[in-house]
């Protein structure tokens, strides 16, 4: 059962674009490939595990634990911690074991790339680097990653608000390509129109390319 989930920019939850398609999220994709004789893991079971299991037990990196725990019981709190890539899943595994497997492998990948030193070199924590790279993924049409990375670093430096539509949409059920003034004014943990600095968590799974763009914009 191949979980070829993950492209950079994948999100945990499904995204409904107003008047358009649904972009299926990681939870839905896992549910789909976990089916065994008609038994599938439910998306809700995966969400419950993500929201309620100690992130350290799921294999989350040490440098992300504080930020994850601050989000309380939000099933989106592990956003960005499943790295893009191809995974082979055992359909007999429980929801907890599947998430643990995916997150543990991703943590290993992130740590093997020296993410802590790389983040430090540009004045960010590893978690902030992941978060910034996720913005690069969601904001950069057609991979203009460097441009967005420069904007992020310049605005954080100023400091001025990032004001990215992707961070407004991340808090909404139904996504509009152009965000409304009302949505921009609403305080959420992610909305960079209404808050200073970066969102509280990544808003997608960042690819290696997006992370590299943050390092060398």
Protein language model regions, located:
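Residues forming well-ordered secondary-structure scaffolds
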Residues: 10, 21-25, 41, 82, ...
């Amino acid at each position: 059962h191949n979980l070829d989930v993950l492209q950079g920019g994948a999100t945990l939850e499904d995204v409904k674009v107003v008047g358009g398609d649904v972009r299926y999220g990681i939870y839905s994709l896992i549910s789909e490939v976990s089916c065994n004789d008609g038994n599938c893991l439910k998306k809700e079971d995966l969400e419950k595990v993500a929201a309620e299991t100690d992130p350290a037990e799921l294999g989350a990196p040490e440098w992300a634990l504080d930020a994850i725990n601050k989000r309380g019981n939000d099933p989106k709190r592990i956003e960005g911690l499943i790295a893009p890539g191809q995974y082979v899943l055992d359909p007999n595994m429980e929801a907890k074991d599947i998430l643990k497997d995916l997150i543990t492998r991703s943590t290993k990948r992130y740590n093997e790339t020296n993410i802590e030193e790389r983040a430090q070199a540009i004045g960010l924590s590893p978690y902030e680097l992941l978060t910034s790279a996720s913005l690069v993924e969601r904001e950069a049409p057609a991979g203009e990653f460097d441009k967005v990375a420069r904007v992020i670093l310049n605005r954080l430096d100023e400091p001025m608000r990032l004001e990215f539509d992707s961070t407004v949409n991340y808090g909404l059920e139904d996504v509009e390509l152009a965000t409304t003034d009302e949505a921009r004014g609403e305080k959420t943990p992610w909305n960079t129109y209404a808050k200073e600095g970066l969102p509280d968590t990544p808003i997608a799974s960042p690819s290696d390319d997006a992370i590299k763009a943050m390092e060398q914009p």
